Design a protein with these regions (language model features):
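Helix-boundary/low-complexity linker signature
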Residues: 1-267
Length: 267
């Protein structure tokens, strides 16, 4: 027989050196955690007071009745409302990197085409409306490539953000406006189970809600009863006065719901 021997460098038997080691996080970007950014609500007074006469968001072809959405906040921490880690059965919750086309959707199925430009907005939030299928930043803008690469979308909240340059956005979007529903369509439907982690909720909130929903039978009737109470017994103020204090802190909410009359504002 013939014996064949192969000589290999010792290093190749020991595996790659430290400088050659590939770690998963080096090639796979982790999901965006919206909690790392200030809540969109934190800029409300700045927009409403300091930039009152400025055009912050311009939209062409905005569908009739559509509301431009800057963010969806579902968690309260005693200081402000913000984004949390919302889990749901179909996995649509949370921001996911999307490129330009939202998974499961296409421009061909979208009912509306529009263009949006923003100026002086704070944070990574990209204004949207409806159920977006495609969102493309204007290629001629200096930061468009990074904005597009950093585009993330939350299918559960129907909101967008970008990890690219912020402050000024120019983009087109294809979207579909959901139809309006009648209350009767939800008569036998229970509200989705809340999986968030609210903390430091003002102690009187639960008692106030219970007090005004005693005769309500369904979850929708409870929501409508609270809505009716706020509309009928509450007052709206857009003045920066003692009755319309800034913020949504625990103390601010406690004072609001215990006061006579109850006075609130858009914030």
């Amino acid at each position: 027989g013939v014996m064949v021997a192969a000589a290999l460098p010792a290093a190749s038997l020991l595996g790659p050196t430290a400088s050659d080691r590939v770690v998963g996080r080096d090639v796979v970007e982790p999901p965006v955690d919206a909690r790392e950014y200030p809540s969109p609500l934190s800029s409300y007074r700045h927009y409403n007071k300091d930039l009152e006469d400025e055009s912050l968001i311009r939209v062409s072809n905005l569908p009739k009745g559509a509301r431009v959405r800057l963010g969806a906040m579902e968690v309260y921490d005693g200081t402000t409302f913000g984004m949390g880690v919302t889990n749901n059965a179909d996995g649509t919750a949370g921001y996911r990197r999307v490129g330009s086309t939202i998974p499961g959707r296409s421009a061909e199925t979208a009912g509306e085409q529009a263009s949006v430009s923003t100026s002086q907005l704070l944070g990574p939030w990209v204004p949207t409306f409806g159920e977006v299928s495609v969102l493309r930043f204007e290629p001629s803008d200096p930061g468009a490539a990074e904005q597009q690469k950093g585009l993330n979308y939350d299918l559960w909240a129907e909101t967008a953000l970008t990890t690219g340059p912020t402050g000024q956005f120019n983009y087109s979007l294809s979207t579909t406006m959901p139809r309006d529903h009648e209350d009767s369509e939800f008569a036998s439907v229970d509200a989705a189970r809340y999986t968030g982690t609210d903390t430091n909720v003002p102690k009187d909130v639960d008692s106030l809600a219970s007090e005004h929903t005693t005769s309500a039978r369904s979850d929708l009737e409870k929501a409508r009863a609270i809505e009716s109470y706020l509309h009928t017994d509450g007052f709206y103020s857009n003045d920066d006065t003692i009755n319309s204090r800034p913020g949504s802190s625990q103390d601010r909410i406690e004072r609001m719901i215990s006061a006579e009359p109850l006075v609130g504002d858009d914030e």
